[in-house]
Amino acid sequence: MKKLLFILAASLMVLGQAYAQKKQTENKKTMEKTEQTNHYTFELSDKITRQKVTFKNRFGITLSGDLYLPKNSGKEIIAALAISGPFGAVKEQSSGLYANQMAERGFAVLAFDPSYTGESGGTPRNIASPDFNTEDFSAAVDFLGLQKNVDRNKIGIIGICGFGGFALNATIVDKRIKAVATTSMYDISRVSAKGYYDKMTAEERTKAFEKMSLQRWVDAENGTPAYPPTHLPEKLKGDEPQFVKDYFDYYKTPRGYHKNSLNSNKGWTITNALSFMNMPLLTYIKEISPRPILLIAGENAHSRYFSEDVYKNASEPKELMIIPNAVHVDLYDKVNSIPFDKLESFFKENLK
C-alpha cells in the first residue's frame, strides 16, 4: 500500500511539474507577444508620461494614439501637438519618438496611427486616402482640444514623410490648426500620379490605371483586396536605389522594425494608389497663410524637392530648413539630425 501511495505521489509530482512547465511556456509566449505589441523603437523619457488613447474621426473610424505629457506640467493649461507619419509607419516608430522629444519641451503631444493601419480601426487593412488621412489630423485636433490640460487655441501639427503632405492639407481646411511643420515631406498624390521627379509618362500612367482596374476584378471575386508579398525586399541585392537601401535600413532592421508597420511587412493594397493618382493634395496651399509653415528636409534626401516646391508655392509666413548631409530617413529617428530645438522654438513662438 505504501509503495502504491509512493508511486501515485511521484506521478502527481511529474504531472505537476509538466503542468507548471506548460504554464511557464504559455506565460513566456504571452509575455513575448505583449512585449512585441508594446515594443517602441525608442526609450521613453523619464520626464514624461505616455497613455494609450482612442478617438473617432468624422467617418466613424476609431483611431489609436499615445498621449505624451510632461510630468512637471501639473494643472497648467498647455499648448498641444498632433503628430503622425511616416506613410506606412506606426506610432511606436518615428511619430512616437517626435512626441517623446516634444513633450520633454513642454507640449501635450498626441502620436497616432492613421485610419486602416496600426492599432487604429478600419477595414480592409493597409489602405490610405487623401480624404481619410487628412481628416485623421483634424480628428486628432478634436481629441486634443477636449483635454482639460490643453489650450484648444494653441494646437499645432507635425507631419513626417507622406503625413507631411496630409498635415499641410489638413491645415488648409482646419483653421483650428495654428501652425504646421513637416519633416522629409512627401506629396503622396504627386508621386503616385507623376512618379518620382514627375517623370511618369502618360503611357505609364495609363498602364498603371489599367493594371489596378483589372486588379479590382480579382479583388471583387475574392471579396478582399490583394497585397504585395512584401513592401520592401527581405534582402537587398545591392543594385537598389540608395533611398530604397535607406528605407530598408530603417524598416527592416532592429533600428526601426515594428510588427504593426506595413512598411516593415507586406505593404499597402495593390490598388491603394488609385485615389491618390486622381485627387491631388495641396491645391490650395496658399490658404494656410497667415498661419506659419516650417518645412524641414535633408540636404541629400531624394524627397527634398517636395519641400522646396511647397516652399515656392506657399504664401508667407513660411520657412525652409535644410539639414546638412541628411538623407530622408535620417529625419525619422536620428535625434542629432532632427532639429528639435527649432521645432520647439517654432511652435512656442506661434502657439501663444
Located regions from the model:
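Catalytic histidine-centered segment of alpha/beta-hydrolase-like enzymes
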Residues: 326-337
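Conserved alpha/beta-hydrolase
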Residues: 101-121
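The serine-hydrolase catalytic nucleophile loop
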Residues: 88-100, 114
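Short beta-strand/loop motif that positions the catalytic acidic residue
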Residues: 288, 294-297
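Short beta-strand element of the alpha/beta-hydrolase
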Residues: 76-86
